[in-house]
């Protein structure tokens, strides 16, 4: 009798965690490598689960794929690890079924690996496992539904063996993209999975609640592998705590929800499996139940903007935004005075960097809130991935929405090692691509875990563009990728060459997404030499450097020459781009205010010529 035939007549018990037990033995390295170096340890765990009552065990191959093994420098051992894993499981299984296990790759950082890379890695491991002839496949811990669907298509095409696919939830009842669990399971069932279910992250209580909203499907079986509990940290080690009796009672509840396979994930041990086997092992499955209707959480629609987005302005006419760095010291008067000068000059928005060059400054959110409150100015608030983890970024976005600061620029952020505190941690939980997606998901009223936020935000998302690279075409490809992620417009690094401006226009003119081209006035010869020699990718022409050097130490001459160079660049930029991004050096708002006036005068002259 095969696995699927067995499931027709009884509830089967899966095994529990492998990593938890190895970790408890003091092993804290690549667990899959133990298939080669310490096979007796893996066999001991398999046997313990079989003796506890498991009808199904899974091979120790969750991370035995190219992507995960390469993190340990073990990618050359992938074949032997998978081969040995199936042999060890077979030798331990007795009458239990052996499933070849393959784990998900994607987490929140969807851009860490492309879908093509994931599929190549999956396909290689799949062939290795199938060659060893397991009784079926277990694809588990898939947080990303797109990834789950794609790898399932590959597996279903290559084998007729039973396939179990378990997705994982950060929040009860929904996947991280907001897809209800019931819909997600139905979609993978339609792609050919024989058993669909959930594992990891959540304990029994939340999984029971989640399954109460899932019907008992006629064409596939249901599986559940809960964590034992939420983990706690004791003396630097993760510890899970759950009473075996609790798991015994939970197993009965899982059966009532229609589960045919009940096992355990992180934190579970043979004791948990024994408790569940005693409770429901071998019992007839439940075939009918009352499905709880998922409560629809009210998500209020965001208020419509009373002003057009910066992308909308730049798509139709001239738009000028000006960067003004928040102060490094606890003195706000000079900053506020500079902001007022720029408002008087008629800019569309003030852009506020997020601890630029990894240097601590007054919070740009505080600056944005104050200039809005005191000057009624619009702010484009930069958000870096460097300083905040996933929790902090979401809290940050919620705060911005609460303050009504709806214009944001999503950037990676300069690494901490270049700033005042080179030993500080650079977080980078997300890339700028992921951050753009996250902000757009907030606009749909969903957090990163898929949990409803109660309202939709109304963020307009800018993305960074660095044209100061050797291969401009590759930089443009990154722009296209950011557009796919949801970027509404771009803000560029400063440009110091008329020809470069022309090249940028030619390479980007096919894009419908507006670009604000960056222009930053030089303040001295020393400033010019610093930019030329120390800022990656930016090279000033000999002519520009000579002009700034010729100005000497005379501050008025330095200012005049710096403005003259900027005006020359603006003459070209304004012909090619509607959006102009002026970067204020050293809080010298007089420079960017004067350049703003210059742009406005040029536009007025052009308009007069057009009218006449």
From Swiss-Prot:
Residues 1-280 form the Hcy-binding domain. In the C-terminal section; belongs to the methylenetetrahydrofolate reductase family. Its EC number is 2.1.1.10, 1.5.1.20. Zn(2+) binds at residues 200, 265-266. InterPro entries: FAD-linked_oxidoreductase-like (IPR029041), HCY_dom (IPR003726), HCY_dom_sf (IPR036589), Mehydrof_redctse-like (IPR003171). Keywords: Amino-acid biosynthesis, FAD, Flavoprotein, Metal-binding, Methionine biosynthesis, Methyltransferase, NAD, NADP, Oxidoreductase, S-adenosyl-L-methionine, Transferase, Zinc. This is Bifunctional homocysteine S-methyltransferase/5,10-methylenetetrahydrofolate reductase. Pathway: One-carbon metabolism; tetrahydrofolate interconversion. It comes from Bacillus subtilis (strain 168). Residues 1-280 are annotated as: Homocysteine S-methyltransferase. Its cofactor is FAD; Zn(2+). NCBIfam families: PRK08645.1. One of its GO terms (biological process) is methylation. Gene3D superfamilies: 3.20.20.220, Homocysteine-binding-like domain. One of its GO terms (cellular component) is cytosol. Induction: Induced by methionine starvation. One of its GO terms (molecular function) is S-methylmethionine-homocysteine S-methyltransferase activity. Pfam families: MTHFR, S-methyl_trans. It catalyses: S-methyl-L-methionine + L-homocysteine = 2 L-methionine + H(+); (6S)-5-methyl-5,6,7,8-tetrahydrofolate + NADP(+) = (6R)-5,10-methylene-5,6,7,8-tetrahydrofolate + NADPH + H(+); (6S)-5-methyl-5,6,7,8-tetrahydrofolate + NAD(+) = (6R)-5,10-methylene-5,6,7,8-tetrahydrofolate + NADH + H(+). SUPFAM superfamilies: FAD-linked oxidoreductase, Homocysteine S-methyltransferase. Residues 295-612 are annotated as: 5,10-methylenetetrahydrofolate reductase.
């Amino acid at each position: 009798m095969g696995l699927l035939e067995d499931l027709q007549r009884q509830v089967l018990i899966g095994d529990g965690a492998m990593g938890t037990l190895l970790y408890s033995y003091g092993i804290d390295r690549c667990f899959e490598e133990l298939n080669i170096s310490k096979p007796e340890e893996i066999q001991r765990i398999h046997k313990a689960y079989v003796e506890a009552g498991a009808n199904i065990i899974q091979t120790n191959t969750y991370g035995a794929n190219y992507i995960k093994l390469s993190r340990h420098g073990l990618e050359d051992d992938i074949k032997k690890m998978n081969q040995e894993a199936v042999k060890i499981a077979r030798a331990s299984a007795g009458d239990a079924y052996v499933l070849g296990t393959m784990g998900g790759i994607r987490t929140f950082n969807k851009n860490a690996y492309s879908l093509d890379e994931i599929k190549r890695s999956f396909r290689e491991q799949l062939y290795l496992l199938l060659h060893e002839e397991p009784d079926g496949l277990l694809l588990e811990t898939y947080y990303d539904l797109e990834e789950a669907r794609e790898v399932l298509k590959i597996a279903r095409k290559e084998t007729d063996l039973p396939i179990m696919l378990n997705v994982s939830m950060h929040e009860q009842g929904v996947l991280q993209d907001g897809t209800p669990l019931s819909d997600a399971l139905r979609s993978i069932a339609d792609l050919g999975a024989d058993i669909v279910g959930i594992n990891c992250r959540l304990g029994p209580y939340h999984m029971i609640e989640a399954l109460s909203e899932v019907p008992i499907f006629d064409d596939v079986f249901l599986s559940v592998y809960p964590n034992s509990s939420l983990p706690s940290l004791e003396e630097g080690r993760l510890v899970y705590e759950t009473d075996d009796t609790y798991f015994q009672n939970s197993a009965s509840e899982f059966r009532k929800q229609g589960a045919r396979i009940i096992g355990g994930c992180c934190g579970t041990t043979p004791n948990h499996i024994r408790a569940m086997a005693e409770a429901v092992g071998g019992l007839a499955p439940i075939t009918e139940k009352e499905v709880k209707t998922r409560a629809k959480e009210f998500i209020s629609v965001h208020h419509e903007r009373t002003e057009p987005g910066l992308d909308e302005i730049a798509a139709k006419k001239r738009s000028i935004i000006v960067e003004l760095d928040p102060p490094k010291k606890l003195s706000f008067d000079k900053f506020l005075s500079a902001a007022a000068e720029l408002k008087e000059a008629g800019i569309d928005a003030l852009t506020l960097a997020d601890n630029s060059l990894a240097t601590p400054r007054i919070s740009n959110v505080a600056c944005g809130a104050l200039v809005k409150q005191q000057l009624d100015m619009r702010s484009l608030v930069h958000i870096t991935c460097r300083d905040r983890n996933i929790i902090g970024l979401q809290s940050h976005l919620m705060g911005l929405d609460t303050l009504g600061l709806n214009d944001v620029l999503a950037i990676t952020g300069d690494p901490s090692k270049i700033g005042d505190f080179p030993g500080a941690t650079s977080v980078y939980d997300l890339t700028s691509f992921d951050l753009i997606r996250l902000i757009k998901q907030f606009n749909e009223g969903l957090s990163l875990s898929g949990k409803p936020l109660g309202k939709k935000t109304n963020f307009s998302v800018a993305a960074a563009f660095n044209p100061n690279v050797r291969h401009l075409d590759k930089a443009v490809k990154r722009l296209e990728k950011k557009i796919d992620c949801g970027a509404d417009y771009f803000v560029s690094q400063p440009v110091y060459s008329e020809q470069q401006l022309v090249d940028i226009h030619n390479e980007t003119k096919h894009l419908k997404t507006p670009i604000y081209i960056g222009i930053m006035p030089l303040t001295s010869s020393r400033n010019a030499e610093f930019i030329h020699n120390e800022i990656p990718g930016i090279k000033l022409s000999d002519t520009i450097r000579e002009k700034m050097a010729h100005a000497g130490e005379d501050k008025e001459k330095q200012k005049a020459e710096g403005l003259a160079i900027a005006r020359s660049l603006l003459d070209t930029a304004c012909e090619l781009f509607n959006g102009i991004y002026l970067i204020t050096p050293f809080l010298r708002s007089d420079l960017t205010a004067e350049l703003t006036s210059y742009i406005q005068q040029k536009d007025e002259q052009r308009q007069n010529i057009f009218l006449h």
